[in-house]
Design a protein with these regions (language model features):
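Nucleotide-activated sugar donor-binding and catalytic core shared by glycosyltransferases
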Residues: 68, 97, 135, 155-157
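Generic recognition of short, well-ordered alpha-helical segments
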Residues: 12-16, 122, 142
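Short, flexible loop segments at boundaries between secondary-structure elements
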Residues: 86-87, 123-154
Length: 157
């Protein structure tokens, strides 16, 4: 599965990638392409807000993921503060205090992954997360059928 593809990945580009992968792996595996899409609302313990409201407000965006650019680009405006931490960052009390100071009374929007780490901190009243979804560019039915077939074969052993 080739992940985080642009939604505009053409059939010709998919074929090129498949050919290159097959040359490198010397296997004739099925290859699938997925993309990430963002929700139209951010969520918190208190409820949801439309992304449009976040895009038009002065908030703090926080990401501790490997490549946060698309997350920031989806939500930010010229007033937005963007904070980046390393992937899988363990937020210390000092980190949380620094985030709180930089945010002031602004909303804080983070990734689902970081929300899990921060939801019970002093940030919880102003903390929201942006849900993501992984979708197949094409052939999702074939992928599902392949997985189900494999599982059925394994249980018959």
């Amino acid at each position: 599965v080739v992940t985080k593809c642009p939604t505009t990945l053409s059939e010709a580009e998919q074929i090129q990638i498949k050919q290159k992968l097959r040359r490198l792996s010397k296997l004739n595996q099925a290859v699938y392409f997925t993309f990430v899409s963002y929700s139209s609302a951010v969520n918190s313990k208190k409820g949801s807000l439309p992304v449009v409201q976040i895009q038009q407000s002065n908030c703090l965006l926080l990401a501790g993921i490997a490549k946060p650019t698309s997350f920031f680009n989806y939500l930010k405006n010229s007033e937005t503060i963007c904070l980046t931490y390393p992937d899988h960052h363990h937020f210390t009390d000092s980190d949380i205090q620094s985030i709180k100071e930089q945010a002031g009374d602004k909303l804080i929007v983070t990734t689902e992954k970081d929300y899990v780490r921060l939801k019970d901190s002093v940030l919880q009243e102003q903390l929201y997360y942006l849900p993501i979804q992984t979708s197949f560019i094409s052939a999702s039915d074939h992928f599902d059928a392949t997985i189900l077939s494999f599982i059925e074969q394994e249980f018959q052993k």
